[in-house]
Regions:
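ATP-dependent adenylation/nucleotidyltransferase module used to activate substrates
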Residues: 4-176
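Divalent-metal-activated hydrolytic enzyme cores
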Residues: 173-185
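Conserved small/polar residues in nucleotide/adenosyl-binding loops
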Residues: 188-191
């Protein structure tokens, strides 16, 4: 049996290899609470474009609320390097079309994986369009999200789009707990 990959160690090695350079990163964010720690951490090493694209959120008013909360967080969070905001389109029809027939699949199953790929594909496309150095997602911070599957999808899309995927498991080293500390009580949902 192969050893399980340690994505946090891979991220540590990538950061150590930057040697003080500040590359650009497209960071897909699922929500403000999950992005709080990730932004605090990665803004030390990257100039970040935060990409909010989550057509799985319903209704549209909730989506807009989350966009506003994401922007508020970016403006209130001290960052070492710049963080800009890039909203993606709200296209819930795409999500429902891709997951049709999977409505009863439990959390952590194939429906989640389809949703991961939909969001990461859009992130890879945006990173390529903006000519950024890397892309990644905040999704791995959640204890409910499968970091191995997220990184597998990210690596596959990196090869397809020619933009390196920044492997990660942000829940490691207390990342999830730190995101709770950084987020107001009303933010304790994880998407």
């Amino acid at each position: 049996m192969a050893n399980k990959r340690n994505y946090q160690k891979e991220l540590d090695a990538k950061i150590a290899g930057l040697h003080g350079e500040v590359p650009t990163l497209l960071l897909h964010s699922c929500c403000a609470p999950c992005s709080s720690y990730v932004l605090e951490y990665l803004s030390q090493y990257f100039s970040i474009t935060l990409f909010y694209y989550n057509p799985n959120i319903y209704p549209p008013t909730e989506y807009e609320h989350r966009v506003e909360e994401q922007q508020r967080l970016i403006h209130s969070l001290p960052a070492v390097h710049p963080i800009s905001f890039c909203p993606g389109p709200y296209d819930s029809d795409r999500f429902y079309k891709l997951t049709r027939g999977m409505e009863n699949v439990p959390e952590g199953g194939e429906r989640c994986f389809v949703c991961y790929e939909m969001r990461l594909r859009e992130a890879a496309e945006m990173a390529k369009q903006l000519k950024l150095d890397y892309f990644t997602t905040t999704l791995s911070i959640s204890p409910l999200k499968n970091a191995e599957k997220l990184n597998e999808i990210g690596e596959r899309l990196a090869a397809e789009y020619g933009i390196p995927y920044l492997n990660s498991d942000f829940k490691k080293r207390g990342g999830y707990q730190r995101s709770i500390e950084l987020s107001p009580v009303s933010y304790t949902h994880l998407t």
